[in-house]
């Protein structure tokens, strides 16, 4: 089983490419955002620490963390973002390591893909066999984020500034998929790469 990290800036199109991979290959996909939501739930390892740090004002009526409210608060404050990441990322990493161990023991899949914007910053280079960078030109990413997620320029700026630069991604990754154009073109790049392992 090959463990492959999938990373790239916000709006680069990681979700669409992972959906293609999920359908066409014998694999499991771990989304770090979903793992993060899991560890933030009431009763899970990060919940109490986050509520203590960000105050109960970030909670919904049912006691769950309001993700939108939390994101607005932390992306506006670099030191707060760093503190929150320091709480969530170790728990997510442990969750992912457990999943890798489980899939290795089951021996049922060819690939385990791990997707996250912050794989490199969080030290995942040492637990994946390869890191893939999903690239898309900044103007295309901005257009996608405005159309698909209705993000403002300010919100896009804040998120992009908190992520690695294109150059940093390229230096750290083993393989680059250019997802600036048609999806079919990106799918072909994936197929060519995956064929090297099958």
Task: State what each model feature region is.
Residues 9:
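P-loop (Walker A) phosphate-binding loop of NTP-binding proteins
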Residues 15:
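Walker A/P-loop
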Residues 37-108:
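ATP-dependent small-molecule kinase phosphotransfer cores
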